[in-house]
UniProtKB/Swiss-Prot annotation:
It comes from Clostridium botulinum (strain Langeland / NCTC 10281 / Type F). GO terms for cellular component: cytoplasm. Pfam families: DeoC. It catalyses: 2-deoxy-D-ribose 5-phosphate = D-glyceraldehyde 3-phosphate + acetaldehyde. Its EC number is 4.1.2.4. The lineage of its organism: Bacteria, Bacillati, Bacillota, Clostridia, Eubacteriales. This is Deoxyribose-phosphate aldolase.
Amino acid sequence: MKLSKYIDHTLLKPQATEKDILKLIEEAKTYDFASVCVNPSWVKLAYENLKDTDVKVCTVVGFPLGATSTASKVYETKVAIEDGADEIDMVISVGQLKSGNDEYVKEEIKKIVEASKNKLVKVIIETCLLTEEEKVKACTLSKEAGADYVKTSTGFSTGGAKPEDIKLMRETVGKDMGVKASGGIHTKEEMEAMIENGATRIGASCGVQLVR
């Protein structure tokens, strides 16, 4: 697979304007990225500009804290799908996971998978806030709940993707689930290190410089 198809070309800054989003979309078309990842309010715009291409529209749910209610996340998911999203990157309830409330975490993911109507669901586990044991648990629960990917980070917390986390996540979920590295990937060497350790998707705001 060519490098560009690993990349979710991402712009999630709250101050991003319509002009910024349109630039992101044009870059995704030019470089043939896997998707653009935008906030929910921009999904319709992305869909309208990408519907005749093979670039997917990805958006975020429960972002960036993961601390909204399950009902809110489900509603966000349904609206995003109606607006044209192909992929949902949801944030787990980190606090519920760290409290040992495994069933809450698993059921929430399951409900979002159901609401996504067979669109791709990626579960952001926010590795920088978790112990090794919690990372394994988050990945296991995500797989059991039927998600398509586990993802390292929002890019809005205390740290981003690390090769060793990707390796652990890949070992935990096995070969038949996607692993997405995101947060702090700025060079081709960093991206290749993630892929070598098992990443099948890369979230990056600097996708163009990664493939040039």
